[in-house]
């Protein structure tokens, strides 16, 4: 399987060619030698096409989907997801916007303003957070507040709440939380608020949750049935055989892969991107383990509290029974 993608993308180099370049340049050699053997193999597999590139990792995603350079790509993906024509007006800064440590498991995060003024946040979590709805709601509210402050500052006395536009939160999961696996036939879950009477009140916040691991399984079993599924497979699947299936079914994706593998010819750049991803992965995994352990501790506390309450209730019941027994004894 090592050279399958080289048949599709002849610019891919051999393993020896990549190793020769690394050995010839001290900076590359120094970085390479800090990696574990498994990491070295993974890097070489990417550069040679033995496996595909993970498109969702921030560096590759932004190289391919950069809205300032190729806005039509992200526009098409968003249009298919939102089921409406989308045109990106500009990219918004999101530095420092993430609440608390919410960036700990993100591998990609971008905020764009659409032509109609609405805001779309597109993010991917490597491992899905616990409480995905609650977390998404908090960050969506933060984006809504940022928009309010920005628009109010621009409009001044002419400001109207009608000037505030929708905020879309589009969340991809590389490894989705367990609750999504209760719905194995669905790879998109759309949520928006509505009233119980049917009266239409615009509450501005909409959410899309996209478990890519489930999308991969569906497309592997049922085939790539439409353009949206083609985009999801492009994002989700780095297996050479699935990349071949995608390019055969939708030849327009060949150009995108060619751009990715052109990046891979720049060993220093890819090595820097790869090192950054490894650093983030290590930090993210530690944070995830801390979060999981804290959740377990919290759950145990609740169980202990419940046991304490049950013991207290039993003590009260025993005391009541002893009191009844004493009363009965007095009657004898």
Predicted regions and their residues:
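Conserved beta-strand segments of the P-loop GTPase G domain that flank and frequently precede/overlap
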Residues: 171-173, 209-211, 234
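Charged, alpha-helix-enriched surfaces in structured cytosolic catalytic cores
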Residues: 69-73, 131, 226, 251, ...
